[in-house]
Amino acid sequence: PGPGSAWTPPFHRGAAKGEVREVLKALHETGRLTRQEAVSMLPVIALGAETGDIVLDMCASPGSKTTQIAECLGDSGLVLANEVVSSRVNMLVSNSHRHGSPCIGVVNHDGRHMPMVPESGFDRVLVDAPCTGSGTTRKNPDVWSKWLPSGGRSLHDLQVDLLSRAVTITKPGGRIVYATCSLDPVEDEAVVAEV
């Protein structure tokens, strides 16, 4: 497999032993392997970033989608990885550095007020919005026991504001992908419909 390839190992996370575990660890530490849920790769595939694009990953930490976008860009273009939560920026920087792509820049802004850089707008914007995570039951089985209808409603306005800003800073003819890991239509379809 080459750059940008995806595969699923024949064992569960944490089950690798001995030499296999050491090889996987070394590949991860040198940026040649990034662990990510297969479903989490779909927004970047939908984004369709290409060599030379200027891309904004608006809600980027921990950086798995950022590095996946960088794979699409090769050595030409830019993915600007933004994270509003200061305590998560270090993880984003670390993962971006580990990947080693010259195309990744990291910034710390509130995505609702993201500056338009470049002035002509971004070619592509990924809004992987903060959400309730109600769609992560496969890896987090206790999600439904804690789920409340008010959760999605409490995030809806923020999600609308993030997507609205993405529309403003994307150049004409560009592409925006809005994604959550929620099954709640208040966080998904209702956000897109409102914007």
Question: Which residues fall in each region the model found?
Answer:
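S-adenosylmethionine
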Residues: 1-195
